[in-house]
C-alpha cells in the first residue's frame, strides 16, 4: 500500500481513508524541496463546492467535514469575493502556501475546470487567510 496508516509518519483522521503528514516526514519534505509531496485531494470530493452551493447542513456527515475544513468552508464567500475567484481557487490556494512544493490531486470535470484550476497560480493569496 502507498499509505501505511499505522506508521509513525501518517496518522489517520476521523475517516480512516484520510491521512495527514506529520513529524519527521513533514520535516523531510520541507527540507528537500526537490521532492514533491502529494497531499490528499484538494477539492475533498466536492466538500467545499457542496458547502458553497448548499450550506453547512448539506455536508453534515460528509467524511471531509472536519473542524478545520468547516472553518475554511465558512470563509469561502468572503475569500472568493476578496480574490474575485472560484471556490476551486480558494481550495487549491492552500497548497500554493505550503512550505514545500505540493501537487494536489485534482480531478477536473472538463476543459473549463482545468482553466479555472490553472488560474490559481495567477492569484497572490495572503497566508493569513489560511492561518486558522
What spans do the regions from the language model cover?
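Beta/alpha (TIM)-barrel catalytic core signal, keyed to glycine-rich beta->alpha loops juxtaposed to Asp/Glu
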Residues: 1-131
Amino acid at each position: 500500500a502507498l499509505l501505511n496508516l499505522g506508521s509513525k509518519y501518517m496518522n489517520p483522521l476521523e475517516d480512516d481513508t484520510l491521512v495527514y503528514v506529520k513529524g519527521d516526514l513533514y520535516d523531510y519534505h520541507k527540507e528537500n524541496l526537490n521532492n514533491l509531496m502529494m497531499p490528499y485531494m484538494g477539492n475533498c470530493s466536492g466538500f467545499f463546492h457542496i458547502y458553497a452551493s448548499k450550506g453547512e447542513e448539506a455536508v453534515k456527515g460528509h467524511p471531509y467535514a472536519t473542524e478545520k475544513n468547516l472553518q475554511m468552508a465558512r470563509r469561502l464567500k468572503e475569500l472568493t469575493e476578496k480574490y474575485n475567484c472560484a471556490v476551486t481557487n480558494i481550495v487549491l490556494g492552500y497548497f500554493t502556501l505550503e512550505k514545500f512544493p505540493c501537487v494536489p490531486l485534482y480531478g477536473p470535470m472538463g476543459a473549463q475546470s482545468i482553466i479555472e484550476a490553472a488560474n490559481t497560480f495567477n492569484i497572490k493569496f495572503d497566508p493569513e487567510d489560511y492561518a486558522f
